[in-house]
Amino acid sequence: MGNDKTNMFVAIALSLVVLLGWHYFVTGPASERQRQAVQSQTAQNTAPQSADGIPSPSPREGSPNAPVPGTVPGAAAQGPISREDALARSARVRIDTPALYGSIGLKGARIDDVSLKNYHETVSDESPRIVLLSPAGSANPYYAEFGWVGANAGPLPNGDTLWKADGDLLAPGKPLTLTWDNGQGLLFKRIVAVDDKFMFTVRDEVENSSANPVTLYPYSLVSRWGKPQTQGYYVLHEGLIGVLGSDGLQEYTYDKVGKEPAYGGAATQGKAWSNVTGGWVGITDKYWAAAAIPDQDKPFTGAFTERTDGATKIYQTSVRGDAVTVAPSASSATTQRLFAGAKEVNQINAYERDLGIKQFDLMIDWGWFWFLTKPMFRALDFFYHLLGNFGVSILLVTLILKIFFLPIANRSYVSMAKMKAVQPEMTSIRERYKDDRTKQQQAMMELYKKEKINPVAGCWPVLIQIPVFFALYKVLFITIEMRHAPFFGWIHDLAAPDPTSIMNLFGLLPFAAPDFIHLGVWPIIMGITMFIQMKMNPAPPDPVQAQVFAFMPIVFTFMLGSFPAGLVIYWAWNNTLSVIQQYIIMRRNGVKVELWDNLRGMFKRGNKSAAAKG
């Protein structure tokens, strides 16, 4: 009885953990996402622009202590135009790499047109490709900008500057050189290079042919107009992100940055980190990001800001380097980088290693339990490259974990088998001391000690699943490698729920089942394996416990209907391995397997009920 209660409490606890976790992390934020969608649409429909669609420069740009320019309030209000029309406002240099395509506008020289060649909006290759960066003037401006700020230096490059280009294509191995003369003795040159993935290298040079020295501060920024529609999950950070030297990782949601004190000007809030060496700043989505990366050996000031212009929120992450003094007839240069692309784990790690970018791997939100999620991903990725299928990798990693935890599980199942072997003695003790609970418990403990039985050993197989379950869930949820990763048959995306539904006979009926009753094939398979696993043991003598155990497979089947298919496949496979393992151990210890008797008993009860009604 004690063991049955313990198992029941553990099962209920696990159910509550999963149910509450799912509500807190997934269903709870659904209303928040809807609210954000409305706000985002409103903001996009009223995005402020200047007459030519480019944000006006701040009147404080000349001050070396001012925030870097780029996205500032005060522009004349004008509705957004189509992305294509916004791109057509300026002559452009084409970007073409194996991973990216887009363009750089010669007006402002912003990197503001980037799409990802290898990623589509849906699993269909015919669906539109992912658009990451878009120009000012469009409905969703999102871009990177590089330049200089300074006092008493004359005109400096800004969003209205018309640059001259030495070519019409930016590609790997084919850098682009842009030049602009301010007419007062300063010649600005910008050399932009791009690799075959997602990294731009920007070298800004300034030549001083005037009679006076000038002091300039190099900057780079990533700017996003309007609050985007985020996933809204608490297990995932979306918003402003960066690593700021010894201050480490900084993550600010779109709401949080607006609650910071005033910074640098009217209608602007934010936070700055001064005298930082090593790091980066950017804006991240679930799968994509744009990040400005300064020279890792030179100090800089990093900042996160939110600026308000009418109904529009303008979010910006920026870095500003220390002062550079350029003497007459001298020149100076600074090199910065821009990451703009998909958060591929191995590529992010390679950039951190090869370019020496401080903690660039934190671009991916591994969470507090990174020591579980990272090894889980590495194992899945290893077998994926070996087998070519992430679904098969999940099955294989689950099998390896079963083998790894075999000693613990074996002791648990052996103890459970011994518990069943002494079931008659336990029943006798309960009958003998049914009126004295204290003596009953003492007799039970003596029996456990005599037979070397651990009454809570049966909890371990369940408890072991909890960290594995959440580690796999995190990997499926955050890593782009799992996005649109197929399994077999109808599973084309392991990171999405099983698309089939019993409510429309798995697609035979011409309607879509509502999400709250969506129940696919794999959740049903999982429920069946869980049902079989529970029928391996005799039914608890307590009717309440028996009902709880009877309904648990049904509850979990419906609950996991909205979980990622990869997670449901893991659970079903893990249940199957547990049944096989428990069956072998019970037979080895001479304990009767109750599965067939329990199944026959169900049918007999069903026949008796039918006969009674007849």
Curated annotation (Swiss-Prot):
GO CC list: plasma membrane
GO biological process: protein insertion into membrane; protein transport
Main location: membrane
UniProt region (Disordered), positions on chain: 35-80
Bias-annotated ranges (Low complexity): 68-80
Polar residues bias locations: 36-49
Keyword Phosphoprotein part of the UniProt annotation: no
Its membrane topology: Multi-pass membrane protein
Pfam families noted in UniProt: 60KD_IMP, YidC_periplas
Compartments in which it is found: Cell inner membrane
Molecular-function annotations in GO: membrane insertase activity
UniProt keyword Disulfide bond, yes or no: no
Keywords: Cell inner membrane, Cell membrane, Chaperone, Membrane, Protein transport, Transmembrane, Transmembrane helix, Transport
Domain of life: Bacteria
TM helices/strands, residue ranges: 8-28, 386-406, 460-480, 505-525, 549-569
Annotated family: Belongs to the OXA1/ALB3/YidC family. Type 1 subfamily.
Task performed by this protein: Required for the insertion and/or proper folding and/or complex formation of integral membrane proteins into the membrane. Involved in integration of membrane proteins that insert both dependently and independently of the Sec translocase complex, as well as at least some lipoproteins. Aids folding of multispanning membrane proteins.
Subunit structure: Interacts with the Sec translocase complex via SecD. Specifically interacts with transmembrane segments of nascent integral membrane proteins during membrane integration.
Name of this protein: Membrane protein insertase YidC
Protein species of origin: Methylorubrum populi (strain ATCC BAA-705 / NCIMB 13946 / BJ001) (Methylobacterium populi)
Gene name of this polypeptide: yidC
